[in-house]
Structures are given as structure tokens and as C-alpha cells.
Regions:
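N-terminal Rossmann-like dinucleotide-binding module
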Residues: 1-49, 58-60
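Short amphipathic alpha-helix with an adjacent loop that forms part of the alpha/beta core around
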Residues: 52-61, 103
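Structural motif
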Residues: 2, 63-64, 87
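Rossmann-fold NAD(P) dinucleotide-binding segment
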Residues: 72-91
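A contiguous active-site-proximal alpha/beta segment in oxidoreductase catalytic domains
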Residues: 95-117
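N-terminal glycine-rich "phosphate-gripper" loop used for MgATP/nucleotide binding
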Residues: 67-72, 94
């Protein structure tokens, strides 16, 4: 499964570890990419769970994208990932302002977010 993490701070790291645990239990092989805003080195135990670290998106399409960067960056991350992921996990709160629920896409929120672009 091709997975992208946007933001790999403490929250992203927690989700990364949990995903690896669940995938291992189910025999799912992961190919994890971390989209980073900083070139600083990750802790070795975290880096070992990541196959690729990138500073900008390319044309790769992912099965799943985790958006775990700061809330103020969620909307732009979603816009940048339009057409690049089949499913999204977005750390709450999804947006800092409901204005983001307007425009060229519609989001329905509950326990799951479904975005129609």
C-alpha cells in the first residue's frame, strides 16, 4: 500500500507507528513516503518506518494520505493532493475556519471525511 504522510511530527509519528503495527498484523506491505518541510534528520526509529522522504510532491498517486501537519496547513495540503490520493486521514480539527467548506469542493464531516473534488 502506497501511503503519504504530510507532516511527521509527534502526531504523524504516532499514526505512522500505529499504521505499521496494523499493517504487520494483517500482512499488508507498506511503501511510506513522508512529505517534509524541513531537511532535519528524523529519529532513527522513525526514519526506519519511512521508505522515501520528499520536500515536494511529484506525480505519484497514493492509496492513502495522512494529513498530520498543523491545522492551518490542512486546506492547502488537501488542495495540493487533489487527484493524488484515493483516501485521506486528516488529523482533527480538519480546518481552523468553516470558510474552507466552501469553494470548488464539498466536504461532509462526521467520523469520516468524504471530499468530492
Amino acid at each position: 500500500m502506497k501511503v503519504l504522510f504530510v507532516g511527521i511530527g509527534s502526531i504523524g509519528t504516532r499514526h505512522l507507528r500505529n499504521l505499521h503495527t496494523v499493517a504487520a498484523e494483517r500482512g499488508i506491505q507498506l511503501d511510506v513516503t513522508a512529505l517534509r518541510s524541513s531537511p532535519r534528520a528524523l529519529p532513527e526509529d522513525v526514519a526506519a518506518l519511512i521508505n522515501n522522504q520528499i520536500m515536494q510532491l511529484d506525480d505519484t498517486v497514493y492509496d492513502l494520505a495522512f494529513i498530520t501537519n498543523p491545522t492551518t496547513l490542512h486546506y492547502n495540503a488537501l488542495k495540493d493532493l487533489k487527484g493524488k490520493s484515493k483516501f485521506f486521514f486528516i488529523e482533527k480539527p480538519i480546518f481552523e475556519d468553516s470558510i474552507y467548506l466552501q469553494g470548488d469542493w464539498i466536504c461532509v464531516t462526521s467520523a469520516v471525511i468524504i471530499c468530492y473534488f
